[in-house]
Amino acid sequence: MLFAQLTHAIGLNDVCDALRLHSGPLSALRGATAPSRNNLSHANKRRDATLAERLFWTVLEHLQKLSPGFATGRQGKGLARRFRRVIHVVDSSTIALIASCIDWAQHRRRKAAAKLHVRLDLHSLLPRFVLVESAKAADSIRAAEVCAGVKPGEIVIFDRAYVDFIHLGVLNGDGVFWVTRSKESLCFRVVKRLPKPTDKRILSDELVVLKNKDSRANYPEAMRRVRALVEIDGKEREMEFLTNNVSWSATSVADLYRCRWQIEVFFKQIKQSLQLCDFLGNSANAVRWQVWTALLLYVLMRFLCVMSSWSHSFTRLFTLLRATLWRKIDLWDLLRFYGIAGGHFRYLATPQSAYLPGFAQ
């Protein structure tokens, strides 16, 4: 399945034929042989996708132990590092499927889709929670499950689709700081207006309580409402943010929510670079297998980025790996010197020969 991701295979025949054509190098992997189409189809349908899920978390844990810098995030800069707290970003993305072939994921009359819920560590850009399911359920139903691993003192940022006042009350009681957008239909009453900062982007800063009887029963405490101008695509838009923290500056609240867009970059990377458009099977199990292997490849590529100080785009790394898939090349040297004038890499062996480290130089 990782091979299918790297080659952007659009069908079972693509995988089987390509592996059969490279049977020589493939046999060097403990005598591996290319699967038949029927065997691959049966495994894709019957083999429990929980195996792929466990493999993903096991590999991620191993890589984090292998390199502490990979776990903590060497890319954490600016706001993420200034807060010196773990910052979680929560969002979901729909993965389009073929409605005529897939009935388990139909969520509209003529559409079918799977939904990927992710809680991302903002410092390391690594997933901390992943849920793959049908797109039928609303995001707010999964809010408590997605945020179950957040610890007291940490920060969680999510879109207004995840707003559930029972869940917000639980987070507040557990000592978790949260930031989200306010729904347009939110009914509230202002109890205190906070001093307005000098930043002209901040339009108002106030403490509010909910007016709706049921909502106030679920969240009786006052919450902070910040109204600010946020630049999106070169234009300033007015947005309203809610948080349970009253000590941060209003500018920090707005900047924190803006960091949530990092998860949009994550979804863009896996959906544009990896194979999440054409699926090798129509069953729920087959779709989950392909999603989990895509996430596994993302983690492996993220590890390569951090350890080799890769300065180019994620897509460029993917195309480079795909081009060198059947070449016995020192990958670290290739990534380290890629794009540098005079940079070089060395072959570990000719493509069709066995690689026996320690026997020959």
Segments from the language model and where they lie:
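Short edge-strand/loop segments of extracellular domains
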Residues: 22
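A short, well-structured juxtamembrane/interface segment
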Residues: 65-76
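Single, function-defining residue in the core of a domain
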Residues: 1-14, 18, 47, 54-55, ...
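Short Lys/Arg-enriched helix C-cap and helix-to-coil transition segments
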Residues: 51-67
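Major-groove recognition helix of helix-turn-helix-like DNA-binding domains
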Residues: 28-47
